[in-house]
């Protein structure tokens, strides 16, 4: 289920963006509207269903997720070119689906027995690395040579597999628990600065690499390379770069080097972004994506490690792990919401100065991420 979700996300994060740009004559506003509605709905969904997650019948919610996934792509198939006028509706349905998915499926993962989790994690990582390289080329080739509709047929196959899997899952080993207590958890955030800082790191993640940066990168790639095939090839190449960066991190990087790594990778990202803004060409696009692939990978791995360290603080692990991870997700999505609000402003930028001012805001987001990541790393060293 998780691998299929990741496969579909590759399509929506890159090739749906390309489709919107093609339909709107390279107007990025529909992309921004889609994501604003999507992340607003994710936040609302995760907040409103938080207590349903602690009841035993979560499998029903998981099946709703798969149904919404089908509705999302069915609308794309039915409306075709007119879907550009309903970007908000797609965002609404996509946000509802994703908010339910990450809320429910994270709990399923947390209930995997410890003896089996390493095997599960290893299999997922291997499959995820494989699809990150192969799937973009497949979608890019199909979209360029056969059209967007043929891509949707492939997606429908994945969705039907998800439907079958959802009826295999059962509510096993998921006992009823107490309701989520956000009021008490907020008091923990006020009293423990490290816990609060870990949430700010998640917020900064939403502002940058897991936010509008992904769409921004896609827009610039399309601006230069034009076709879905080129987008697919580049996405696959930089997936390989990401895998290489992960290998280096796992085998060569020591914990004492983390702060230097955060500073260096974020500094180089800013330099590469400025270069791409001032001179958008093949070389600046490749340079930025190369640097960003390393920076994003290192930031994610370092911050994920620190997030897990904080989750095992006595004040959290005894009673508030559910609240801790739920709020981390919410902070990420709040960051993404702000990030895409800034992204939407680019659609109204009618001169170079306006564009540059908005891009400076993204640079400030990167600097903020660097600062909070370093502070949390120092606390956990």
Positions of PLM-derived features:
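Juxtamembrane intracellular "pre-TM" segments in multi-pass secondary transporters
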Residues: 171-205
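Hydrophobic core of transmembrane alpha-helices in multi-pass small-molecule transporters
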Residues: 84-101, 283-300
């Amino acid at each position: 289920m998780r691998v299929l979700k990741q496969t579909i996300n590759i399509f929506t994060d890159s090739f749906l963006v390309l489709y919107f740009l093609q339909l709107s004559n390279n107007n990025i506003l529909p992309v921004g509207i889609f994501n604003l509605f999507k992340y607003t709905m994710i936040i609302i969904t995760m907040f409103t269903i938080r207590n349903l997650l602690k009841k035993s019948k979560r499998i029903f919610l998981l099946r709703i997720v798969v149904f919404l996934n089908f509705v999302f792509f069915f609308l794309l198939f039915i409306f075709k070119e007119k879907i550009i006028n309903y970007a908000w509706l797609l965002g609404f349905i996509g946000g509802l689906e994703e908010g339910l998915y990450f809320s429910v499926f994270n709990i399923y993962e947390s209930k995997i027995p410890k003896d089996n989790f390493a095997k599960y994690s290893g299999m997922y990582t291997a499959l995820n690395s494989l699809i990150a390289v192969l799937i973009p080329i497949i979608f890019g080739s199909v979209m360029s040579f056969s059209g967007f509709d043929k891509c949707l047929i492939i997606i429908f196959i994945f969705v039907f597999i998800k439907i079958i899997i959802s009826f295999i899952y059962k509510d096993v080993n998921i006992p009823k628990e107490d309701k989520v207590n956000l009021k008490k958890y907020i008091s923990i955030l006020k009293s423990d600065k490290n816990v609060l800082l870990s949430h700010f790191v998640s917020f900064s993640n939403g502002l940058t690499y897991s936010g509008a940066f992904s769409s921004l990168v896609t827009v610039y790639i399309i601006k230069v390379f034009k076709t879905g095939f080129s987008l697919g090839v580049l996405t696959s190449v930089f997936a390989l770069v990401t895998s290489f960066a992960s290998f280096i991190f796992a085998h060569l990087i020591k914990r004492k080097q983390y702060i230097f790594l955060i500073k260096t990778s974020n500094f180089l990202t800013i330099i590469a972004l400025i270069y791409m803004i001032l001179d958008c060409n093949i070389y600046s696009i490749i340079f930025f994506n190369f640097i960003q692939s390393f920076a994003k990978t290192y930031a994610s791995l370092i911050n994920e490690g620190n997030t897990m360290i904080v989750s095992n603080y006595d004040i959290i692990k005894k009673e508030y792990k559910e609240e801790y991870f739920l709020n981390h997700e919410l902070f990420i999505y709040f960051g993404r919401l702000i990030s895409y609000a800034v992204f939407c402003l680019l659609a109204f930028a009618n001169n170079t100065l306006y564009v540059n001012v908005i891009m400076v805001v993204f640079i400030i987001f990167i600097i903020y991420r660097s600062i909070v990541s370093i502070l949390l790393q120092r606390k956990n060293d």
